[in-house]
From Swiss-Prot:
Primary localisation category: other
Entry protein name: Translational regulator orb2
PANTHER family tied to this protein: CYTOPLASMIC POLYADENYLATION ELEMENT BINDING PROTEIN CPEB, TRANSLATIONAL REGULATOR ORB2
Organism per entry: Drosophila melanogaster (Fruit fly)
Stretches with biased composition (Low complexity): 9-42, 176-205, 218-233, 417-429
Amino acid sequence: MDSLKLPKANSATSSASGSNSNLSGSTSASASAATSPTSSGTAVGGILSGAPKSPPGLGSSTPISVRFNANEESLDDILQSFHHSKHSPSGGASGGGDASPTSNLLGMKNNGLGLVVGNCDSLSSSPSQPQMHAGSASLFGNDEVSLRNNFMQAGGFFNRKSCGGLPNLNLNKPPQLHQQQHQQQHQQHQQHQQQQQLHQHQQQLSPNLSALHHHHQQQQQLRESGGSHSPSSPGGGGGGSPYNGSQAGCSSGGISPIPPQMGVSPKYRRSISFPIKGNSPTAIYGNMHMDGMGSGHMNIPTLSIGNGGGGGSTGMVSAGATGGGDAPYLGNSYGNMMTSNGQMHHGGGLDNSLCDYMRNMSLGGNGGGDGSNSMSLMQDRMRVMGGPKHLSEADAMAIAASGNDPSVYLNALKMGSPSRLSPHSPHSPIQGGNGGNVGDGTARFSRKVFVGGLPPDIDEDEITTSFRRFGPLVVDWPHKAESKSYFPPKGYAFLLFQDESSVQQLIDSCITDEDKLYLCVSSPTIKDKAVQIRPWRLADADYVLDATMSLDPRKTVFVGGVPRPLKAFELAMIMDRLYGGVCYAGIDTDPELKYPKGAGRVAFSNQQSYIAAISARFVQLQHGDIDKRVEVKPYVLDDQMCDECEGQRCGGKFAPFFCANVTCLQYYCEHCWAVIHSRPGREYHKPLVKEGADRPRAVPFRWC
């Protein structure tokens, strides 16, 4: 701490002292440090306190003491910098627009080293409060001086290395030209030295070193060319306080580091830029662009604390007092920062980010790009997250909104078949690709295709003739072997192709109308009748809402009678809307053709939702054209041990019975079932038995 005792004179004489000192006068002011993102010096603060003494007279030679925490700078250096700052307009003050009136109000200016006094070259003790007002009014005006003094007396902030705003500072003599030139050279020399100090300090302080260092270099070049002193540079924050935008000189705001030795005053009332606490994002702010006034700046999101709001730069992210984790002062918006090129920063995880991303798209915005950008964004996000990830609800929303092929997103996901203990489908080869056959890991569609709306007089041979051009196939329909009929009884049939590539060719030849595929087929009496083609996409067999939850077979239900067009995503949404807590849904498919069998599974994340689902017993599935009543019961496994004896009373065999009553919900061997359910109140419980392994119906395939 440097103590400077100055007699009443035009020249300031410095004297070092380690004791605290007071500034004689009638008004006291307390100072708090305010850092600027464009300031290249270490943040310092000065404290000035007034002693309860009467002001001296005109002839008094009472010395005044000014205490600065200015490191290596002397008062002469500071006074020399006062001259140049008067004629240099400042940008980036609070509330947006020109910051000069606000800065001149307190006689402070940003010269790259901090806010300093403008347009003064001497310090003198003020003989009286009226004379002080008269001396300052010549420069500011009576109203401005009154407002300034009221602000200082009310305990307002006082920026570092600032003499402006004190009641006993007389601002009068204009500087000479040679003094201004000397001031500029000295200022640039000091700025270069302190910038090196800040660079060394940031290596230990800020995790955003590379981005901020790049930012300081850009701002240094702009200051030398005069670009950063644009009078109309927008600033951050709002309100009438001159300290709302403490980031003078940076048009878009920035995340300014605060040294650990400098505490932030608890008296802040407006917007104050804080450094990001905890794990800060890496250097994602490297993209520069030019604003409307031609000054380049980086689109760095600024975290605004308190009740500041309103106008400011486009990069401002307002954070209230809410939030959690290691940064409780951050609002929920922090996890959803996006860089200027539309790439989303990973702050709150994939689901939270994409939910906000898709919400913006649903409100009419472009969501950061078109469908192709959404596609690349999804793939980049999956690559950043790392590891196998399941499809989430936000992913499906992105697929639906972008209008792209869902397989593009699913190619990056691994939703392979789990073990026998998992309720996943045991045949779910979602491995992506652009075609191929079953078994080669690149299939996208089932080789079984539904054809509806056939002419009533069309037979099997005519159907085969109509679709043979796409590849070898077999025509099948329900109960074909028993009926011994050559005509599909209900106007629909299934095409069983030998190769999955034939399905791709069929889809390419179809006509699309309202997301449905049609192809013209002729019969002996009807020419070119449009029939519906409904292929089954393998990706629609599984859907995961919450990839962080492990699937528990004891919290999984079996849904019977599921309509074949119903997808796993649609089943999950229906069950989650009814009971909540759904983390997975799957559609049972046959092991050979991978086509839905008319049943599904839904896994819940909590016991309450599971019990509510099995207690309802029946559910009405309503989705689009689908309106069907389906049965819900516990999902029974055939490889579970008895929960009572753990295989000791049954020779280590798997338990054949499962009690679905909410008072039991356990697996039992035959012995334990008889013992437990002979008790009062349980004699009416009925066991559920796992049916045999899924076996496809034997079809005498003869590829035509």
